[in-house]
Amino acid sequence: MQIRSLMFFVLACLLATPAVAQDKAIAWQGKGANGETIDFQPQALRRPAVLLFWATWCPYCKALMPYLQHVYDAAGKDKLDVYAIDFKDEDGDPVAELRERKQTFTLVRDGDPIAALYGVKGTPGLFLVDVKGDIVYKRISGDAPEKVEVALRDKLGLPERP
């Protein structure tokens, strides 16, 4: 009888819980490659945005970033923003690293406070934010770069890469 009552209580709690809305992106300010202020306001986006939390020393970031560049190139700069938020990177030179890798993302330097806002503790972290400010994709730890590219293309309505 007690188990039956417990099951009923759990079921009632589950049914009474409202549907969970998608996570909302959090506004932030950061410094760009030349020290300019970058003001990310998710409720006022004109196009979707990818937030990539990375570090120059991170081999997983290095593996993921070319796939993200393919997505960025396919979407076009007028249809997608990509912010490469450098964090946990005291000794690296993110400007030189992006240049060397031929990656054209918007660099955000010293992004540790932004990573903390999003609960990112390791690299790479990746979020796709739609024009309503909803986080519609999060890279799950361990997702292969190819899988991330496919997911982003799907969410952005882009064709698969040939």
Enumerate the language-model features and the residues they cover:
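Hydrophobic beta-strand anchors of alpha/beta hydrolase catalytic cores
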Residues: 50-51, 82, 126
